[in-house]
């Protein structure tokens, strides 16, 4: 089967935004205009095509990035819909990793919102070019130029309108194209056929002003254009478009368009901007990877290169089972063929290849470089794995995922649920790298951990619906940590005689605090073989094993150094096990000397509220042991930034809603660990039965 669309005519884009900026509706309209849907689905009626999990339709938010393919003006556009809620930033990171460009959707009333900033920063990290779509121009309070201003103020983005709106709120009727210098009016409800007219007289001056600003901004990025501009020569519209494309691809310039997806206005010109200014797979740098011999190598977007791809999402589909979404970076892949999962060192068979259209799937026999598709039949592949040609193996740069910050205990309601719960949790953990399920060795409870309350709510909900498992969920528990504040030299000695061969391990270790974020560091400073070389790894393993169960309240120990500097051994009785135990005893003994403390996760919280609630909200943050880090006015709202312990943030959403009559919003994400105040540390130790027991 020959390639249907050339690489140059392929676009892999994401739609990214703050929750509720109208991202899913925007994607819907794209699918409608590109002929993939015959009836428009409304998110607020729960009938959207992209939101295909039941909970997404109920809650009206997008949780899973469904990958969809569409066609527009002879181009293939693969769209990944990304969630806007902060608990799902891993989904956003995961999709940005495999995109070439993105459309950032803003709400015309609010402009840049907290989650927009988070997603924008992630896109900048991955060097993703962006077009900005100012949506909801029909909404009360919509203000296009204010929204563009927020891009400059809050994101320091070099963003410039390539369109202006004609009217706003309920008088929004079309857009001015600053490149063609004409006006598009939408006169039918579906916006299928906009009428091209002259720019209205009352907007002519504004259009000239912004056309001038656009030309100047583009000229600044290109020497040749700058010379023409300074010499007063006319810059043609072809040169202007080429300049915008170059600046956008270099992530130095962001074209801004406007419209209202809900009222079907401005979506097609936004699609044109995607084709005109966002990159084809051939415009982005080749992806780097590591060959089996450790050498670095690149893979280019080219069908003739060896096959290489990255699995970026695993899902369980009720009809076809396990689906692995992957992005092809080089080469081609036929259904029914074998590939190598080079990350895990496993051979996998690709049963079928599907191209997804939200929740309708199309089977295809081959995928080419630059494509996004889903494979059926892969057994061992998880998110972030490389799939490649068996003969030309490579491991592509993988993805890094944040550690979970919130934990809850979960119990099956019946014996029948118990067996199914284990399988369900394993499946969910396979799909989502930021979700963990484990059994507490001491209490036997099953604990699940994730990125926030909503994240865990939705996973428990999925367990009930998809796997038919009923479960009771406990109160959220914070993932505390422990560390040392002082250095000390400590002995660990394990001697046991029980007839016949005994056990003997003896170490002296200097423990001390490490820099924040450095983790555990082990140093072997043994001289003269007082502890034989073959037992050193056992000492390190003994310490690493004991770190999971801290000395105060049993929380994992982080950011400590251990230097093994002395010890002794017995010719007959010493063995690896004895040195492992001796090392873990030394760590226990360090509790008395190293001033251990409990650390708690601190969240960076941003609250956006109307001015009149400012005093109450600030007071409430302080009462939650938070400290305010900064404030600013944003439009007619106040933004409060603070660091608050996670332990005091449970139930905050409900408090904020009731305290501001539903007008306040907040986002939070893990920032760093901090020492817990003494009185609270005592409560935590007491609640955990104290862990500092003699072994």
UniProtKB/Swiss-Prot annotation:
Molecular-function GO term, any one: translation elongation factor activity
Keyword tRNA-binding: no
Gene3D superfamilies: 3.30.230.10, 3.30.70.240, Elongation Factor G (Translational Gtpase), domain 3, P-loop containing nucleotide triphosphate hydrolases, Translation factors
GO BP terms: ribosome disassembly
InterPro entries referenced in this protein's UniProt entry, alphabetically: EFG_II, EFG_III, EFG_III/V, EFG_IV, EFG_V, EFG_V-like, EFTu-like_2, G_TR_CS
Alphabetically ordered keywords of this record: Cytoplasm, Elongation factor, GTP-binding, Nucleotide-binding, Protein biosynthesis
Gene Ontology CC: one annotated term: cytoplasm
Residues in tr-type G domain copies: 8-282
Cellular localisation: Cytoplasm
Keyword Iron assigned: no
Binding site for GTP: 17-24, 81-85, 135-138
Protein role: Catalyzes the GTP-dependent ribosomal translocation step during translation elongation. During this step, the ribosome changes from the pre-translocational (PRE) to the post-translocational (POST) state as the newly formed A-site-bound peptidyl-tRNA and P-site-bound deacylated tRNA move to the P and E sites, respectively. Catalyzes the coordinated movement of the two tRNA molecules, the mRNA and conformational changes in the ribosome.
Protein family per UniProt: Belongs to the TRAFAC class translation factor GTPase superfamily. Classic translation factor GTPase family. EF-G/EF-2 subfamily.
HAMAP family: EF_G_EF_2_B
Protein name: Elongation factor G
The organism of origin for this protein: Listeria welshimeri serovar 6b (strain ATCC 35897 / DSM 20650 / CCUG 15529 / CIP 8149 / NCTC 11857 / SLCC 5334 / V8)
């Amino acid at each position: 089967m020959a390639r249907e669309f050339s690489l140059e005519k392929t676009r892999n884009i994401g739609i990214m935004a703050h929750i509720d900026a109208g991202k899913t509706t925007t994607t819907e309209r794209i699918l409608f205009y590109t002929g993939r849907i015959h009836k428009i689905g409304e998110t607020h009626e729960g009938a959207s095509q992209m939101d295909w999990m039941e909970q997404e339709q109920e809650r009206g938010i997008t949780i899973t990035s469904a990958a969809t393919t569409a066609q527009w003006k002879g181009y293939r556009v693969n769209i990944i819909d990304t969630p806007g809620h902060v608990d799902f930033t891993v989904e956003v990171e995961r999709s940005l990793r495999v995109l070439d460009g993105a459309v950032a959707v803003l709400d015309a009333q609010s402009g840049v919102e907290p989650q927009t900033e988070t997603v924008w920063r992630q896109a900048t990290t991955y060097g993703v070019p962006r077009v900005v779509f100012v949506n909801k121009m029909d909404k009360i309070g919509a203000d296009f130029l204010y929204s563009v201003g927020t891009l400059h103020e809050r994101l320091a983005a070099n963003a410039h309108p390539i369109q202006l709106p004609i009217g706003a709120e309920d008088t929004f009727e079309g857009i001015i194209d600053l490149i063609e210098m004409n006006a598009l009016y939408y006169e039918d409800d579906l916006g299928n056929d906009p009428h091209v007219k002259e720019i209205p007289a009352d907007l002519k001056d504004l259009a000239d002003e912004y056309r001038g600003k656009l030309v100047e901004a583009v000229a600044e990025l290109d020497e040749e254009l700058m010379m023409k501009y300074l010499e007063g020569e006319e810059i043609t519209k072809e040169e202007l478009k080429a300049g915008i494309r170059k600046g956008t691809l270099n992530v130095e310039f962001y074209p801004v368009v406007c419209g209202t997806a809900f009222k079907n206005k401005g979506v097609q010109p936004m699609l044109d901007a995607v084709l005109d200014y966002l990159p084809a797979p051939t415009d982005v740098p080749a992806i780097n990877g590591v060959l089996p011999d450790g050498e670095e190598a690149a893979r280019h977007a080219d069908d003739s290169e060896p096959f290489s791809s990255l699995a970026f999402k695993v899902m369980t589909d009720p009809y076809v089972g396990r689906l692995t979404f992957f992005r092809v970076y080089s080469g081609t892949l036929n259904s029914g063929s074998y590939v190598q999962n080079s990350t895990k060192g496993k051979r996998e068979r690709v049963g079928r290849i599907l191209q997804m259209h939200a929740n309708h799937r199309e089977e295809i026999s081959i995928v080419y470089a630059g494509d996004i598709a889903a494979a059926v039949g892969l057994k061992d592949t998880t998110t972030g794995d490389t799939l490649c040609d068996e003969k030309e193996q490579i491991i592509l740069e993988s993805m890094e995922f944040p550690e979970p910050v919130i934990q809850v205990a979960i119990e099956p309601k019946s014996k029948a649920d118990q067996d199914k719960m284990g399988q369900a949790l394993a499946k969910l953990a396979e799909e989502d790298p930021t979700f963990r399920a484990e059994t507490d060795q001491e209490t036997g409870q099953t604990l699940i951990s994730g990125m926030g309350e909503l994240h865990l709510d939705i996973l428990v909900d999925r367990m009930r619906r998809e796997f038919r498992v009923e479960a009771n969920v406990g109160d959220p528990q914070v993932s505390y940590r422990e560390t040392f504040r002082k250095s000390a030299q400590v002995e660990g000695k394990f001697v046991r005689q029980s007839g016949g061969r005994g056990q003997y391990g003896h170490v002296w270790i200097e423990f001390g605090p490490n820099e924040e974020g450095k983790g555990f560091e082990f140093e072997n400073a043994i001289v003269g073989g007082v502890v034989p070389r073959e037992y050193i790894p056992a000492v390190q393993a003994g310490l690493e094993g004991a770190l999971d169960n801290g000395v105060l309240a049993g929380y994992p120990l982080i950011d400590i150094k251990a230097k093994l500097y002395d010890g002794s051994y017995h010719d007959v009785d010493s063995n690896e096990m004895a040195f492992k135990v001796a090392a873990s005893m030394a760590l226990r003994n360090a509790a008395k000397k190293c001033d251990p403390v409990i650390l708690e996760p601190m969240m960076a919280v941003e609250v956006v509220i109307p001015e009149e609630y400012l005093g109450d909200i600030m007071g409430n943050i302080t009462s939650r042991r938070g400290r305010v880090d900064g404030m600013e006015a944003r439009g007619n709202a106040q933004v409060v930034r603070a660091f608050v312990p996670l332990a005091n943030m449970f139930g905050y959403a409900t408090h904020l809603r009731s305290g501001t009559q539903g007008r306040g919003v907040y986002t939070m994400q893990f920032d760093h660990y901090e020492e817990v105040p003494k009185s609270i540390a005592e409560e935590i130790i007491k609640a955990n039965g104290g862990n500092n027991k003699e072994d």
